[in-house]
């Protein structure tokens, strides 16, 4: 665990962030830990920028339209199905999909606000039920592989309390437009892409960027031949300072 005080982090040449999925409830402590490490990837500045999804507003590319509600802001529900989730979150914690006019959404927003969260409100795109989302993975700034994920949030479902809603994953080849948008997304990140050990760009039909995962994304290495070897080689190079 990243918060295990018994670990001598200075003993390691390189720490690679992977499964720190409990950080949303104590983001400040997580970032302080990362900043205390001798060498960590992705870098602490990347983690600070990426662990609050308000970064989406600064990318300047085609993203899923998002309204951010600060504590005290009231929800004006879209006239179509929509998704409510916290801006600091991992997996499907705190996320739920609602139909237009569902009054439970306001209660959901208030609960998130009461916990100190900024809330994201996004339209649910109808094509997601059929096409799902495509996740494009990059290692050392270079495209590695992609998977397709089926729609995960059922209409009217309860906000996720565990780390994950069950996923259905399959290997896929991204379209030319999807790859081009993912490449532009990495170029829009305010850090040199070659310095990103790993990155995952999640796209919805359009294509539109849903998220750019630079902190602790599942990389689905088992869905692409050679992906694990590419990551291992990149870690080895980084540990040698290359």
Where are these regions (language model features)?
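A short beta-strand motif that forms the metal-chelation/ATP-contact edge
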Residues: 12-17, 85, 134-138, 205-218
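ATP-grasp fold ATP-binding core
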Residues: 59-60, 66, 78-95, 116-131, ...
């Amino acid at each position: 665990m990243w918060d295990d005080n018994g670990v001598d982090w200075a003993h390691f040449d390189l720490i690679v962030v992977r499964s720190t999925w409990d950080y949303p409830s104590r983001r400040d402590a997580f970032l302080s830990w990362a900043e205390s490490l001798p060498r960590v990837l992705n870098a602490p500045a990347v983690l600070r920028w990426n662990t609050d999804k308000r970064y989406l507003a600064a990318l300047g590319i085609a993203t899923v339209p998002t309204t951010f509600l600060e504590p005290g802001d009231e929800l004006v529900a879209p006239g179509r199905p929509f998704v409510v989730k916290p801006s600091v979150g991992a997996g499907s914690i705190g996320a739920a999909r609602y139909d237009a006019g569902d009054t439970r959404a306001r209660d959901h927003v208030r609960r998130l606000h009461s916990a100190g969260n900024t809330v994201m409100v996004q339209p649910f795109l109808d094509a997601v039920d059929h096409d799902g989302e495509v996740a494009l993975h990059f290692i050392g700034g270079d495209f590695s592989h992609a998977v397709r994920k089926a729609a995960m949030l059922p209409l009217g479902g309860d906000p996720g309390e565990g780390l994950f809603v069950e996923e259905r994953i399959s290997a896929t080849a991204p379209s030319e437009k999807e790859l081009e948008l993912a490449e532009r997304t990495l170029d829009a990140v305010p850090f040199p892409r070659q310095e990103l050990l790993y990155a995952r760009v999640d796209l919805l039909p359009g294509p539109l960027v849903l998220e750019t995962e630079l902190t602790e994304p599942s990389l689905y290495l088992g869905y692409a031949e050679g992906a694990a070897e590419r990551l291992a080689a990149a870690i080895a190079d980084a540990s040698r300072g290359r």
